Amino acid sequence: MDSDASLVSSRPSSPEPDDLFLPARSKGGSSSGFTGGTVSSSTPSDCPPELSSELRGAMGASGAHPGDKLGGGGFKSSSSSTSSSTSSAATSSTKKDKKQMTEPELQQLRLKINSRERKRMHDLNIAMDGLREVMPYAHGPSVRKLSKIATLLLARNYILMLTNSLEEMKRLVSEIYGGHHAGFHPSACGGLAHSAPLPTATAHPAAAAHAAHHPAVHHPILPPAAAAAAAAAAAAAVSSASLPGSGLSSVGSIRPPHGLLKSPSAAAAAPLGGGGGGSGGSGGFQHWGGMPCPCSMCQVPPPHHHVSAMGAGTLPRLTSDAK
């Protein structure tokens, strides 16, 4: 009995576990850290004032909230678990919706998807047929229709070829009309096309008269000095030829200048593209395939005046009229 009474009496007098833990925690709080205090106490108000002040000081020194050490990772894990649960819920709801759909509804959904895909393929085939119609091989002897990939590759090559051709044409036109290769229209065109009547001036007076009015270098792109020199040379060649009298030169002086020929002032005022140009190496104008001569005389052939129809008796009369 005494032992039992002593045991009963000793129980209230014995310290509680919390009373034993708090002094030890207050003594070793600065050395062992605050993790144990945070775990054991649910809120800072449950701790003594000195312990809570120490915890606040330690948390303030570390620059974190008392609940950040333990609550940060928990919040992240909870957010990730929430997102995963949301996605799984959406997937399960979709599956439930499909499962809840009846067989006629599923069949209707399949038909709708199939009709949409069929319309898309129909539009694609129409577009491919329209592209095949404008391809270079469309009117050729091909017997089978190209596939979609082959059609697209052919269209790409065709576009590249046309682009290169256009760039080459632009380069040739800039060389012809640029004006930086030659200062005036070269004499290759005139020498080949318009100087042929000069050697036959002694045999054909009409051709000589035509050459007098249409000299070898007559293009309006020529400078005034070059045009005047060419006209003087042509007149000298005609006058030195063995012609019957000076009647033909008088006819040349009576006739007005050709309507297509421009005066030196007009030629200087309206040059064609800043002067003619030719190929840089040869220095002469070359007629490229499909590109006519840019001068007005080559574009519009002059009307031929039949001077040879005039008899020998009319020439002295014209000479007397001129006098």
From Swiss-Prot:
Biological process, per Gene Ontology: central nervous system neuron differentiation; myelination; negative regulation of neuron differentiation; negative regulation of transcription by RNA polymerase II; nervous system development; neuron fate commitment; oligodendrocyte differentiation; positive regulation of oligodendrocyte differentiation
Signal sequence region: none
Subcellular location: Nucleus; Cytoplasm
CC annotations in GO: cytoplasm; nucleus; transcription regulator complex
One MF annotation (Gene Ontology) recorded for this entry: identical protein binding
Stored SMART domains: HLH (SM00353)
TM helices/strands, residue ranges: none
Predominant localisation class: nucleus
Keyword DNA-binding in annotation: yes
Biased composition annotated in UniProt, kind: Low complexity: 77-93
InterPro entries for this protein: bHLH_dom, bHLH_transcription_factors, HLH_DNA-bd_sf, Olig2_bHLH
Domain bHLH: 108-162
PROSITE patterns: BHLH
Region (Disordered): 1-107
Compositionally biased intervals (Polar residues): 1-13
Induction: By SHH. Also induced by NKX6-1 in the developing spinal cord, but not in the rostral hindbrain.
Record flagged with keyword Acetylation: no
Tissue: Expressed specifically in the brain.
Quaternary structure and partners: Interacts with NKX2-2. Interacts with ZNF488.
Domain notes: The bHLH is essential for interaction with NKX2-2.
PANTHER family: BASIC HELIX-LOOP-HELIX PROTEIN NEUROGENIN-RELATED, OLIGODENDROCYTE TRANSCRIPTION FACTOR 2
Purpose of the protein: Required for oligodendrocyte and motor neuron specification in the spinal cord, as well as for the development of somatic motor neurons in the hindbrain. Functions together with ZNF488 to promote oligodendrocyte differentiation. Cooperates with OLIG1 to establish the pMN domain of the embryonic neural tube. Antagonist of V2 interneuron and of NKX2-2-induced V3 interneuron development.
Protein name, as recorded: Oligodendrocyte transcription factor 2
Species whose genome carries this gene: Mus musculus
